């Protein structure tokens, strides 16, 4: 399969496409219209059957095989055959980053953005095509519109040529897909998939077509990489980006196994395309070949290859070993380097590279990592965006996240509120802010205000109803009974709703929803009476690594410790029941986190050891022991005992399985091992 794909990209004819990409006014090509798109969602085209793999490899009929080898577009309607569709068009979207110093924005006036569609240069041939230069120009304008909160204007600018220009197709479908991901509405998801199919077909028109002889000779020789025309090079990058996004939507569209296979194959094909494009990039640089829009192709390769390297490197060791067996590999340092190089360039994808790095620093490192965040780089990368788009929702959102990670909760609150107020067009951005504001109020123990935002999420967002309802009930559980009555909510009823609200993605339950369902069982109608959860809001705060944020604030850590110690005292006065040991261990874990944040390591260690020593007595919350071992490792690392810390990490990773949130802990262990091991140990 890999050899055949290599043929597609390497054995190109001797065409030197003269489509000159044009530098932006003022000499700088603006950030990709889709850098902005949610910290790293890339464009998303998709195409037909024969062009991705020779038909004889797919096992089609003789007529179909000949059409495929000749690059006929009759193959584009292959969707009826789900397995061939899975083999042919393979994609998943990668998260983007923000990058470095010399970031250039398109100098187009966004006020005039929805300009005349006739501005695009169209070839005079019967088959209408928009040239590369015009496609890049209009995408840069659309990017500025998007970052300026003019989402509909950006769509309308790109829509007229979305079936003729690869970059219009990529930009248009990316915005539609982003909207689908944010709303989680089935109709929006279907619209995203439809837009993605059209985009892939549009990109397919620009990809290299093979004759039978070329297909056969390419199998025997790598050919000359530089023989790929500039337009065809861009078509490969756009096609790969579209495949990634289509794969992402495939996972959320339905939970059946066929969609899971299709999505996985799309990812693999996209990955292989990026590998081949990286080889082409190196060949061009080595031979110093002249291409007018080389910087745009380079930006696309850096974004795709860098994001793949970064994301694959985050995976737990056991998954990495499996993926390496089927041809994947990831290197975190290389991925960050490629993204930083892409971000420092002048391509449209520079902004996407920046946003990918920002997503890594402000979200991924916290939720799936140790909480050790490179805030300085995040601030440096965001600075040019803040200057250019001071009221852009996406820019403000990242600004608020950075303030939050610095412990400036009050400043973060103000910026999140501003992010909500600057636009009404995409309410989904509001939901992201509601989530953050809910947690800020949890950190501050402003329970009524936290309830307000959790209630908004329950009513307006469809991302994870089970999680939202559980959190609302958990927050209400922290309030005095009279305050709960004033809300007209019934905590027991809310907890009992959780199980019916859980969903599946790619055929799998969402780990945090499974966790919420298990915890809510204590309120099941089948029990003689509900057994009240202990500190459920703080437990969820721990699950989302909120104690890492609170560690920057001594006052908040002290207040949380008071709350935990009150719960500890209340437990000691209660009658013993089947949940008592589990509740006691949870309280000890939370107390240990507070003590560690307050620089009281010996007391924290005593709390953690109590949990580990109670392992055999736990009946329900078996996740507490491996997570506590991780906290002990973190404690020892902070005291300079690296070898001891690594030993505890390996114990947590190797000696425990089948507990709640296991994959999340394995992600954190992988991140910690990567950061803490000496270079020689790697």
Swiss-Prot record:
Protein origin, superkingdom: Eukaryota
TPR repeats (start-end): 393-426, 626-659
Sequence similarity: Belongs to the TTC39 family.
Function: Regulates high density lipoprotein (HDL) cholesterol metabolism by promoting the ubiquitination and degradation of the oxysterols receptors LXR (NR1H2 and NR1H3).
UniProt KW keywords: Lipid metabolism, Repeat, TPR repeat, Ubl conjugation pathway
Designated name of the protein: Tetratricopeptide repeat protein 39B
Cleaved signal peptide residues: none
Biological process, per Gene Ontology: cholesterol homeostasis; lipid metabolic process; negative regulation of cholesterol storage; regulation of cholesterol efflux; regulation of cholesterol metabolic process
């Amino acid at each position: 399969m890999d050899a055949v794909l290599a043929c597609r990209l390497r054995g190109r004819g001797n065409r030197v496409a003269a489509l000159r990409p044009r530098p932006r006014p003022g000499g700088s090509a603006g950030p990709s219209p889709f850098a902005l798109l949610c910290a790293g969602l890339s464009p998303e085209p998709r195409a037909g059957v024969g062009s991705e793999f020779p038909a004889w490899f797919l096992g089609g009929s003789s007529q179909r095989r000949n059409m495929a080898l000749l690059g006929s577009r009759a193959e584009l309607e292959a969707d009826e055959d789900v397995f061939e569709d899975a083999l042919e068009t393979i994609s998943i979207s990668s998260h983007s980053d923000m990058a470095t110093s010399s970031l250039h924005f398109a100098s187009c006036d966004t006020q005039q953005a929805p300009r005349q569609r006739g501005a695009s240069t169209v070839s005079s041939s019967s088959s209408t095509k928009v040239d590369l230069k015009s496609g890049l120009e209009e995408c840069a304008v659309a990017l500025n519109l998007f970052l300026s909160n003019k989402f509909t204007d950006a769509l309308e600018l790109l829509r007229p040529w979305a079936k003729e220009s690869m970059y219009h197709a990529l930009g248009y479908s990316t915005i539609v897909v982003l909207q689908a991901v944010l709303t989680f509405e089935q109709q929006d998801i279907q619209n995203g998939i439809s837009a993605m199919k059209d985009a892939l077909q549009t990109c397919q028109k620009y990809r290299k077509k093979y004759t039978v002889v070329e297909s056969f000779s390419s199998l025997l020789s790598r050919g000359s990489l530089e023989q790929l025309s500039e337009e065809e090079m861009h078509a490969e990058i756009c096609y790969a980006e579209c495949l990634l996004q289509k794969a992402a939507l495939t996972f959320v569209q339905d939970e059946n196994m066929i969609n899971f296979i299709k999505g996985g194959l799309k990812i693999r094909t996209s990955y292989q395309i990026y590998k081949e494009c990286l080889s082409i990039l190196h060949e061009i640089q080595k031979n110093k070949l002249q291409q007018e829009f080389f910087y745009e192709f380079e930006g696309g390769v850096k974004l795709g290859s860098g994001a793949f390297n970064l994301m694959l490197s985050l995976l737990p060791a056991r998954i990495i070993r499996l993926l390496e067996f089927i041809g994947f590999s990831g290197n975190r340092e290389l991925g960050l380097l490629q993204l930083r190089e892409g971000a420092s360039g002048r391509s449209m994808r520079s902004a996407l590279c920046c946003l990918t790095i920002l997503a890594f620093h402000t979200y991924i490192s916290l939720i799936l990592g140790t909480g050790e965040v490179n805030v300085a780089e995040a601030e440096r990368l965001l600075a040019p965006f803040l200057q250019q788009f001071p009221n852009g929702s996406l820019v403000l959102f990242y600004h608020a996240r950075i303030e939050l990670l610095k412990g400036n909760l009050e400043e973060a609150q103000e910026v999140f509120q501003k992010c909500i107020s600057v636009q009404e067009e995409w309410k989904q951005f509001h939901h992201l802010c509601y989530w953050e504001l809910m947690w800020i109020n949890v950190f501050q123990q402003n329970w009524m205000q936290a309830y307000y935002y959790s209630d908004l999420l329950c009513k307006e967002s469809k991302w994870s109803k089970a999680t939202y309802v559980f959190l609302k009930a958990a927050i209400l559980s922290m309030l005095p009974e009279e305050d709960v009555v004033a809300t007209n909510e019934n905590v027991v009823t809310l907890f009992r709703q959780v199980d019916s609200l859980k969903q599946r993605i790619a055929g799998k339950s969402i780990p945090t929803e499974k966790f919420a369902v298990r915890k809510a069982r204590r309120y099941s109608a089948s029990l003689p009476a509900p057994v009240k959860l202990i500190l459920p809001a703080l437990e969820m705060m721990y699950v989302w690594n909120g104690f890492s944020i609170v560690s920057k604030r001594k006052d908040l850590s002290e207040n949380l410790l008071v709350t935990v110690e009150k719960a500890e005292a209340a437990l000691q006065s209660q009658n013993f029941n089947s949940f008592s040991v589990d509740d006691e261990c949870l309280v000890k874990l939370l107390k240990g986190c507070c003590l560690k944040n307050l620089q009281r390591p010996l007391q924290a260690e005593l709390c953690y050891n109590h949990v580990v020593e109670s392992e055999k007595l736990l009946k329900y919350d078996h996740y507490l022991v491996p997570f506590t071992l991780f906290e002990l490792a973190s404690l020892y690392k902070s005291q300079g005992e690296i070898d001891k810390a690594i030993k505890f990490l390996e114990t947590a990773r190797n000696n425990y399985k089948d507990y709640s949130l296991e994959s999340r802990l394995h992600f954190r262990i992988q991140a910690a091992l990567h950061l803490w091991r000496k270079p020689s140990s790697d």
